[in-house]
């Protein structure tokens, strides 16, 4: 493997950074292997799943930021974080893994993934459910948020990648 970064070549070590390495968002239920363009598990695009280990940290960070933005948007559409510190305290107390660099709506989704069936009073966890979604159980709410997250990722893929591929294919046929 060739190292092109002159800072690495001169010192023999990778450049120091204060940024944490981006971990794979894979959750072990990949649907790209059965033909989906967007994974139903982690919501990455199929080419991102395939090439993830070859991505630079900046490329991984770009994907991570897009995913966290979509998840936050899907979650904020149905819930409001009313006490960020309480939510974070509950995550820490319950030993729920979350990325501190993501916003509180991503944290909330991690809480719902870990314990939606055990939460009877969302206010004690620092959030409330919007009235239009209050008739759902937190498990159903979590699943709806996850579905919205996938829809946002799929719409982004369809708008910015699949459309480009259509035009590229047409140009190649001419």
Describe the residue ranges of each PLM region.
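Conserved small/polar residues in nucleotide/adenosyl-binding loops
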Residues: 167-172
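Extended, charged alpha/beta regions that create polyanion-binding interfaces
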Residues: 152
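Short cationic/low-complexity microdomains
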Residues: 126-141
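N-terminal cysteine/histidine-rich coordination modules
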Residues: 2-76
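Metal- and O2-centered redox machinery and metal/ROS homeostasis
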Residues: 158, 164-166
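Short flanking/linker segments adjacent to small metal-binding domains or redox-active Cys/His motifs
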Residues: 76-130
């Amino acid at each position: 493997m060739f190292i092109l970064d002159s800072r690495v070549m001169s010192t023999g070590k990778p450049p120091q950074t204060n940024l944490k390495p981006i971990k794979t968002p894979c959750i072990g239920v990949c649907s790209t292997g059965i033909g989906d363009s967007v994974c139903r598990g982690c919501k990455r695009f199929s080419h991102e799943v395939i090439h993830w280990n070859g991505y630079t940290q900046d490329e991984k960070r770009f994907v991570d930021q897009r995913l966290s933005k979509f998840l936050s948007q899907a979650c904020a559409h149905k819930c409001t974080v009313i006490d960020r510190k309480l939510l974070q305290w509950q995550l820490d107390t319950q030993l729920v893994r979350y990325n501190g660099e993501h916003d509180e709506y991503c944290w909330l989704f991690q809480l719902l993934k870990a314990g939606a069936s055990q939460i009877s009073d969302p206010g004690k966890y620092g959030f409330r459910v919007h009235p239009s979604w209050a008739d759902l159980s937190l498990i159903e709410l979590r699943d709806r948020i996850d579905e919205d997250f996938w829809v946002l990722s799929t719409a982004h893929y369809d708008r910015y990648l699949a459309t480009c591929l259509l035009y590229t294919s047409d140009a190649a046929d001419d």
